[in-house]
Amino acid sequence: MLRFAILELLSHKLLSGYELKKRFGGSIVFFWRAAHSQIYPELKRMEAEGFVAGDKVPHPWRPTKKVYAITEAGTRELVRWLRERTDIQAVKDEMMLKCFAFDLIPPEEAARQIDHHKTLHDRQLLRYREIERDLTQKHGDPLQTSDPIMFWNGLTLQYAIAFEQMYIEWCMSALSQLAAFHARVVGLGARAETPDRAVDVVAGAGGAAA
């Protein structure tokens, strides 16, 4: 799949390997990740296959950089892939894998794990909101534009935001239900057995629901 992500980016503009790395860390990070060490070997393979063409660009005071462009063969390969039906993707979520066996650790430790994960997704959501704000300030609402590139970029960003919101809501619900479960099973006050940060989240969730 990495090659198709690269072809997609190159279909928009010429990019160096370093610029591709930056794009993977920004515009498409919310649905596809790639390590720097993966990008250059893949570019080399794709160049050998004729899907991209590299051109060395000299610079007066900086090192010469190699800029890549998608070829006609690369465009055909990308379009062929775009027209293929996509199956449901296998989900790999380490947090959910742990959650499946959280009965093996104390509830307060499980609560800390969930609360920490919520914090991470809060940060990620904030990052996507910043991207959304910058995009809107520069180009207007991407979902109301007549530019097809901006429109589809906007849709994928909308997905990323919705995913983070869903995950945060799940974490809050899980903390609330865990507190109730612990009180039910052990017969202790949920607030006494839930870490302080998680208590605040649970209390906030309860207040919002009320």
Model-derived segments and spans:
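Basic helix-turn-helix/winged-helix DNA-binding cores
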Residues: M1-K92
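Acidic interhelical loop/turn segments
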Residues: E132-L155, V185
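Amphipathic alpha-helical dimerization/coiled-coil segments
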Residues: R80-E130
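N-terminal/domain-start alpha-helical segments
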Residues: A205, A209-A210
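Long amphipathic alpha-helical coiled-coil segments
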Residues: S173-A192
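Alpha-helical scaffold segments that form or flank carboxylate-/histidine-based iron centers
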Residues: Q38, K66, R112-Q113, M150-I161
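Heptad-repeat amphipathic alpha-helical coiled-coil interaction surface used
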Residues: A111, K118, D122-L125, E132, ...
